[in-house]
From Swiss-Prot:
Residue runs in coiled coils: none
GO cellular component, one term: plasma membrane
Name of the featured protein: XK-related protein 5
Major site of localization recorded for this protein: membrane
Compositional bias ranges of the Gly residues kind: 523-536
Residue ranges with Polar residues bias: 455-470, 490-509, 550-567
Membrane topology field: Multi-pass membrane protein
Keywords, alphabetical: Cell membrane, Membrane, Transmembrane, Transmembrane helix
Family listed: Belongs to the XK family.
Length: 686
């Protein structure tokens, strides 16, 4: 089917471009120089498309030979992409890398073809439609050119939608009937819109630009109100809204990952109202109804009717998720569903548990270490494990700026990393060029997980816990992959005496005295438990990002779904030998985080960046010392380098470590025991 779609796209493009060139020559040979120069000027925006195609070739690793430059100067760069994609599609039994590369080639081709159609074919369609109507349907050359341009622009929209959907994980094959319905939908809506604008221009001339400008402005503000998260940069986000608002003058494209039923209905209702008003004004129907005016209005609006019927048929019968769409419409019409907002809510159970933990956090006041489980795109294979943080972060930024990463975000209609990681699981890696190695994320994680389990417990010296925490992995046979956003807060409290602990909180730990001594050693106190310097310690906040898997614990039936972390009684800075940690304590599920996937996130405090830890007075840690305990992690996986991001919000008294479910605000006063059981509770964001 790939070869057939590529062949159909090439055939329509060849017919449209041939008709366009013949129309230009026809105008010059017949002495209609104005139309000839206007038709020739429409070709100029095509150089922007060719420039983008050339830059994308270079980004994919193609050498910038003179032949490649000449092809793009002759506006044949898109044709070269057609040729390359056809060669890849016609290979017998292509391997998985070739299939992934074919998807990227088709995505590049469909995006460039859509851009070329909007910049060249759209203006040419409007121009030739006006010339054809001005000649009272007698000039056959502009009429044929109008037909091919109309079909080509509609197919460019269908092809873009199809190939973007093909990049989604778990996609289903789209039958030819679905493509035919989409083509009728696009042609019907485009035909009505183009005829309305051209007829209004014939009657009111340049006032049509006022109408188009007002429509552009309204659509741009509407897009801003919808808050699409595909683009991260503020400047680029504004430019994106302006460009999409210009596209909405003619057609509709969806850029939101939420259900677009209400948006689509709103857009087409506005278009129907606007087209009807333009037709009534253009045909002088308000001054006096005539049979000719009625025929014109009915003929033009019949295209909108055909497009609407095709749209309904496609989404109700031929869409890959037509059953879910139909059931959603029925639930909403019956009042069962509460709308799109209910589909975006977090898990009530997780929210309730997080709320309870926040309310019962007690009087422990101290540093907060937040572990936000989010996905990160892996770094290239070319980056050595000993490379510094700056090098690997630069490589990651280069990956995120690659145009193939933009296709992933456009296909999923979101730029949220957690949503993208939730969509692309272990069995459906993101397809990227071989140089980026994104499809090898599963192998890296599996190797890191297995290597981490092989580490002996004796090698985990307590001194290494000054800058990092060791967590046990979860076996894939015992865990279901599920995208979570979890918060782990390490609060520390300092007390002169060892606090009273309940049995549940002290399971797997040392004695209370040992715990108090450990905290004293951590905070730099003397033997008597007094602080050095007499002043409150500055608290620090570590922010990390990691991927996680939620384990299904069968032994905790009947209890709240709380993932508990194995805590071994080793304390920061403890001088006495630590008890070996049990890999799987009874009743405690292992922490579902892979150390090889942890990467830093900048804190929210006033002092952001790499800085010495304030929790160890009298000693300044260098960057190399901070990264030293994490070197085994880098050896396990060439992931983004893990650093320690510190934010020093205020002076506090240091307290003993305590693990809670949500990050605590620095101003919250609590009254709980400071030796509380370490827990990790997932919060789901869909």
């Amino acid at each position: 089917m790939h070869a057939g779609l590529l062949g159909l796209s090439a055939l329509l493009q060849a017919a449209e471009q041939s008709a366009r060139l013949y129309t230009v020559a026809y105008y010059f040979t017949t002495g209609r120089l104005l139309w000839g120069w206007l038709a020739l000027a429409v070709l100029l925006p095509g150089f922007l498309v060719q420039a983008l195609s050339y830059l994308w070739f270079r980004a994919d690793g193609h050498p910038g030979h003179c032949s490649l430059v000449m092809l793009h100067l002759l506006q044949l760069g898109v044709w070269k992409r057609h040729w390359d994609a056809a060669l890849t599609a016609l290979q017998k039994e292509p391997e998985a890398p070739h299939r992934g590369w074919l998807q990227l080639q088709e995505a590049d081709l469909s995006a460039l073809r859509l851009l070329e159609a909007l910049l060249q074919t759209g203006p040419h369609l409007l121009l030739q439609t006006y010339v054809f109507l001005a000649s009272d349907f007698t000039d056959i050359v502009p009429g044929v050119s109008t037909l091919f341009s109309w079909s080509s622009l509609s197919w460019a929209l269908v092809s873009y939608t199809r190939f973007m959907g093909f990049m989604k994980p778990g996609h289903l094959a789209m039958p030819w009937a679905a493509l035919f319905c989409q083509q009728l939908w696009r042609m019907g809506m485009l035909g009505t819109r183009v005829m309305s604008l051209v007829l209004f221009y014939k009657a009111y001339h340049f006032w049509v630009f006022v109408v188009a400008g007002a429509h552009w402005l309204v659509m741009t503000f509407w897009l801003v109100a919808q808050q699409s998260d595909i683009i991260d940069s503020t400047c680029h986000w504004r430019l994106f809204n302006l460009l999409v608002g210009a596209v909405y003058i003619l057609c509709y494209l969806s850029f939101w990952d939420s259900p677009s039923r209400n948006r689509m209905v709103t857009f087409y209702m506005v278009m129907l109202l606007e087209n009807t008003i333009l037709l009534l004004l253009a045909t002088d129907f308000l001054q006096g109804a005539s049979w000719t005016s009625l025929q014109t209005i009915a003929g033009v609006l019949s295209g909108f009717l055909i497009g609407s019927v095709s749209l309904v048929i496609y989404y109700s019968l031929l869409h890959p998720k037509s059953t879910d769409i139909w059931q959603g419409c029925l639930r909403k019409s019956c009042g069962i569903a509460g709308g799109d907002k209910t589909e975006r809510r977090a898990s009530p159970r997780a929210t309730d548990l997080a709320g309870k933990r926040t309310e019962s956090s007690g009087s422990c006041q101290g540093a907060s270490y937040e572990l936000t489980i989010l996905g990160k795109p892996p770094t290239p294979e070319q980056v050595p494990p000993e490379a510094g943080l700056g090098t690997q972060v630069a490589v990651e930024d280069s990956f995120l700026s690659h145009h193939h990463w933009l296709w992933v975000k456009l296909a999923l209609k979101t730029g949220n990393m957690s949503k993208i990681n939730a969509a692309f699981g272990d069995d459906n890696p993101v397809y990227c060029p071989p140089a980026w190695g994104l499809s090898q994320q599963d192998d890296l994680q599996r190797k890191a997980l297995s290597a981490q389990r092989e580490l002996p417990s004796s090698s985990r010296h307590p001194s290494t816990l000054e800058n990092s925490s060791a967590f046990e992995g979860v076996s894939k046979a015992e865990a279901d992959p599920l995208e979570t956003s979890s918060y782990v807060s390490f609060a520390s409290d300092q007390q002169d005496e060892a606090p009273t602990q309940n049995p549940a909180a002290t399971q797997g730990e040392g004695t209370p005295k040992e715990g108090a001594d450990a905290v004293s050693g951590t905070q730099g106190k003397g033997t008597g438990g007094q602080q050095r310097g007499g002043e409150g310690q500055q608290s620090s906040t570590l922010y990390f990002s990691a991927t996680a898997e939620v384990a299904t614990s069968s032994q905790q039936e009947g209890s709240p779904a709380t993932l508990q972390t194995a805590h071994s009684g080793r304390r920061l800075g403890k001088s006495s030998p630590a008890q070996p940690a049990s890999p799987h304590p009874v009743g405690l599920a292992p922490f579902p985080a892979t150390m090889a996937d942890i990467s830093p996130i900048l804190g929210t405090g006033p002092c952001r960046g790499f800085c010495p830890s304030a929790g160890f007075p009298g000693r300044t840690l260098s960057i190399s010392e901070l990264e030293e305990p994490l070197e085994p992690t880098r050896e396990l996986s060439h992931h983004a380098a893990v650093g320690v991001w510190m934010s020093l919000p205020q002076l506090r008294t240091a307290h003993e470590p305590c693990l809670t479910s949500t990050p605590k605000s620095e101003s919250i006063q609590t009254d709980c025991s400071c030796r509380e059981q370490m827990k990790q509770e997932p919060s789901f964001f869909i």
